[in-house]
Amino acid sequence: MNISPYRTRIKFCGMTRVGDVRLASELGVDAVGLIFASGSSRLLTVSAACAIRRTVAPMVNVVALFQNNSADEIHTVVRTVRPTLLQFHGEEEDAFCRTFNVPYLKAIPMAGAEAKRICTRTLYLKYPNAAGFIFDSHLKGGTGQTFDWSRLPIDLQHPFLLAGGITPENVFDAIAATVPWGVDVSSGIELQPGIKDGDKMRQFVEEVRRADGRRLFGVA
C-alpha cells in the first residue's frame, strides 16, 4: 500500500441540505456526495440535487453515487447535475461505469467473507479504468459499521478512500493505521440520516488535520 506524502482528502457523503454543503465547503472538504441509489434514506431527486449543486464552492468535487441504477438514470444525472465524479456501489462492471465519460470510483464491500479473497490484481483486472476505489463495510454504504482494516489490499497503486463507520472519534486512528488517500464519512457526522451535525463536521475535519500533522510533520 502506498504511503502518501500528501494530506488526506475528505469526502462528506449523503448530503441533502444546502446549509450542510455550504458548511462543508467552508471547512475545506474536498468532495461532497449526492446519493441517487434507490432505497437510500439519503436519496435525492434530480431537482433537489441541482439546487445543492449550485451552492457547491469552486474546487470542491461533486460525487454522484449510484447502486445498480439504469444507464438512463445516470445519463440524466450527469447531464443535469454535472457531477465531477461518479461512484458505483452495485454490480456495475468497468465497461458500464466508463460509459458516461466521467471519472468513476468503485466501492468495494469489505465486511463479509468475500472480502478475504480481494487482492490488488483482481481489482485492477475488474476495474482497469477506475480512478480509485472506496473500501466500505457494506455494499450499500452509510451503515455506520466498520470493518477489519487489515483486510485492505496491499500494494494498491490507485488512490483509495476509507469508508465504513468512520467518525470524529476514530478517524485519527483510521488514518494512522491505513494511510488512505482520503476518508469518506456519512453517518459519522449526522444527527439522523441525511441531516448533518455541524459540530461533528468540524470535529471530523479537525481530527483529519491532526492526523496529517502527526503523520507528515510529527506534531500532534
Curated annotation (Swiss-Prot):
Coiled coil: none annotated. One of its GO terms (molecular function) is phosphoribosylanthranilate isomerase activity. It catalyses: N-(5-phospho-beta-D-ribosyl)anthranilate = 1-(2-carboxyphenylamino)-1-deoxy-D-ribulose 5-phosphate. Gene3D superfamilies: Aldolase class I. Keywords: Amino-acid biosynthesis, Aromatic amino acid biosynthesis, Isomerase, Tryptophan biosynthesis. InterPro entries: Aldolase_TIM (IPR013785), PRAI_dom (IPR001240), RibuloseP-bd_barrel (IPR011060), TrpF_fam (IPR044643). It comes from the Bacteria. The keyword Protein biosynthesis does not apply. The keyword Membrane does not apply. Its EC number is 5.3.1.24. Pathway: Amino-acid biosynthesis; L-tryptophan biosynthesis; L-tryptophan from chorismate: step 3/5. GO terms for biological process: L-tryptophan biosynthetic process. Signal peptide: none annotated. It is an enzyme of class 5 (isomerase). Belongs to the TrpF family. This is N-(5'-phosphoribosyl)anthranilate isomerase. It comes from Xylella fastidiosa (strain 9a5c). The gene is trpF.
